Amino acid sequence: MKVENHNLAVASLKTQRISAFKARLVAVLLKGKKVSDALAILSHTKKKASPIFTKLINSAVANAINNHGFEHSNLIIKAAIVNEGPTLKRFRPRAKGAASQILKRTSHFKVILASQNGGESQNQEYQETEKNLVSKSPENTQSGALSQQSQAEQPQNDPENGVDSQLSAKTNSITTAKKTDLADNNTKNDATNTVLAQEKEVK
């Protein structure tokens, strides 16, 4: 007997000598039924899996009532699960030295009971667990880390932009100074040329 939370009770039985296909024909009839209705259905179902499910339901009901104080009338079957177990392989001798294979299949049974009164709290717990799983998912953690890195890089980029603007201002001032020097040199050359021309005319 396993108890997952305050509103669910799980009873399991393993390695039963029945195929999962045949057992699931009975499991389909039990899902969503009240415990009393499920036991009535099993009592009128002539299948090999019927006594197995009856045993599981009675065990889960007894533990739920004794451990959690649930009322028998409020219990419903939330799920009846049948999984495949290990398969035993045997051989049957046939004619002319041949042999045919025999598969003895087994199954694992699980019945989950829920309380009708605790449905709202159960849904709240389920939603909270979903939120926690989503918040702890690797995609969200990576996105959060990237956002933190981008926020950390933004203030570092601002001083770099300031340095770049200062360098561009210095280069502009240097180019303007060079242009003014060239203009002064040109004016000086023009003045010397005019003086030389006047001297030649005088001679």
UniProtKB/Swiss-Prot annotation:
The keyword NADP does not apply. Keywords: Ribonucleoprotein, Ribosomal protein, RNA-binding, rRNA-binding. Residues 183-194 have a biased composition (Low complexity). Residues 116-127, 134-177 have a biased composition (Polar residues). InterPro entries: Ribosomal_uL22, Ribosomal_uL22_bac/chlpt-type, Ribosomal_uL22_bac/org-type, Ribosomal_uL22_sf. GO terms for biological process: translation. The keyword Transferase does not apply. Residues 116-203 are annotated as: Disordered. Pfam families: Ribosomal_L22 (PF00237). One of its GO terms (cellular component) is cytosolic large ribosomal subunit. Belongs to the universal ribosomal protein uL22 family. Part of the 50S ribosomal subunit. This protein binds specifically to 23S rRNA; its binding is stimulated by other ribosomal proteins, e.g. L4, L17, and L20. It is important during the early stages of 50S assembly. It makes multiple contacts with different domains of the 23S rRNA in the assembled 50S subunit and ribosome. HAMAP family: Ribosomal_uL22_B (MF_01331_B). This is Large ribosomal subunit protein uL22. It comes from Mesomycoplasma hyopneumoniae (strain J / ATCC 25934 / NCTC 10110) (Mycoplasma hyopneumoniae).
